[in-house]
Amino acid sequence: MAKEKPHVNIVFIGHVDHGKSTTIGRLLFDTANIPENIIKKFEEMGEKGKSFKFAWVMDRLKEERERGITIDVAHTKFETPHRYITIIDAPGHRDFVKNMITGASQADAAVLVVAATDGVMPQTKEHAFLARTLGINHIIVAINKMDMVNYDEKKFKQVAEQVKKLLQMLGYKDFPIIPISAWEGDNVVKKSDKMPWYNGPTLLEALDQIPEPPKPVDKPLRIPIQDVYSIKGVGTVPVGRVETGVLRVGDVVIFEPASTIFHKPIQGEVKSIEMHHEPLQEAYPGDNIGFNVRGVGKNDIKRGDVAGHTTNPPTVVRPKDTFKAQIIVLNHPTAITVGYTPVLHAHTTQVAVRFEQLLAKLDPRTGNIVEENPQFIKTGDSAIVILRPTKAMVIEPVKEIPQMGRFAIRDMGQTVAAGMVISIQKAD
C-alpha cells in the first residue's frame, strides 16, 4: 500500500490588512477549493471576467466572515503533490491563540504575510514572536501586494531584509521569502511572469516542501482527556488525543491530577483502544482515541485529567507548588500586577492561576532582560513570571514535553497572554 501523504497544519499570520484572507482566498480559488455554494451563486449571476470572479468570491467570503461565519474550516483543506494541507486558523479569529494552544490545532508551520507597501509592522513582530512562543518551527514568508509596488525587485529586497532580521533574531533559520500578489494571483499557485528576477518557489510549492512533522514517540506518554463516556458492556471510556509517547493494550496507566486530588492512585491496565470505531493494539501521537482502563470508574476522571504510564506519570502542580513561565501579554486593558488571578488554558484543562511574582521584563525580540522585578506588565510586554494554580493541574516544562508546556491565559472573554512553562518548583 502506498504511504499516505503527510498531513500538515498551517496558520496564516501577519499585520492586519496585509492580505492574509486574500492570500488564503487565492490559494483556495486557484486550487479549486472554494466552497461550492459560493461558486454556484457566482455562476447563477452569469458574470463574465476572470479577475472579476476572484474579486466577487473574495467579497462573498468577506461577507460570510463579517456575519460571523469564518470560512468553514472543513473547506480549508487542500492538496499539494506531496502534502495534505489544512489551514487550521484563518486570521481575525478572536480565539486564534487559545485554539492554537488548546485545540486540535497545533500548527506545523506558519505563513507570515507582509505587505510590500508597508514592510514590517507592529503586528508582524507580535505574530512572529507568538509563532515562536507557540513552538511553530517552520515559517514561510509571503511578501504580498507586489502589484502595488510595480513588481519592483528593489522594494522586495528591502522588505525581505527587514523580515529576515526579525525572524533571525527570533531564531528562525532557512525560511523561503516569496514575492506574491494574492489579488492578481502572482506566485501563489501559478508562477508569475511579472517578476523574472525571482526564481524561487511559488507559495504552493513552498507549502509542498514543509517538513513532515516528527511524531514525538520517544517522549513519555501523555493523553489529555477530552471526555469520559460510559459504554454498555465495555465500561468507562476516556477519550483524548495522544500528544506524546505510545499507548499499547496491556499498558498500566495513571491519571493525574485525579490521583493527587483523590489521594489514591487512579490507575489500571488498558484493556482496549479504539479509533474511528476500529480496535487498535497501539496508538501514536496525533491519534484521537477512546480507551478502556480496568478498575477506573466514570467518576474517577474528567476532562483535563492526563493519562501517562505509571513508570513516568504526568507532572502535577498543586496549589502549594509554583511554576516559572515566560509569557507574552497580548491583550490586557490595563496592567498585570502580582495577585492577578485569570484562567490558564493548557491541553484540555482550565485552572485559575495567581501571579505570584513578576521576575523580569524581556525585550520581545531578543529575549534579553530589560527590567528586573517590574511593578507591572502590560500589552506587548514579554516577561518571566511565577504562577501558582488554585487547584492541582498537569503541566510540563516546555523543554521536556513541549506539547504539554504551552498555555493561554484568558480573562473577560479574551486571550490576555500566551506562554510556556520554564520550570516547576515543588513545595516538598
UniProtKB/Swiss-Prot annotation:
One Pfam family hit: GTP_EFTU
Binding, Mg(2+): S21
Gene from which this protein is expressed: tuf
The keyword GTP-binding is annotated on this UniProt entry: yes
Keyword GTP-binding in annotation: yes
Family: Belongs to the TRAFAC class translation factor GTPase superfamily. Classic translation factor GTPase family. EF-Tu/EF-1A subfamily.
Name by which UniProt lists this protein: Elongation factor 1-alpha
Organism annotation: Thermococcus kodakarensis (strain ATCC BAA-918 / JCM 12380 / KOD1) (Pyrococcus kodakaraensis (strain KOD1))
Start and end residues of each stretch annotated as G4: 144-147
Enzyme Commission number: 3.6.5.3
Cellular compartments per GO CC: cytoplasm
Subcellular location: Cytoplasm
Catalytic activity: GTP + H2O = GDP + phosphate + H(+)
Gene Ontology terms, MF aspect: GTP binding; GTPase activity; translation elongation factor activity
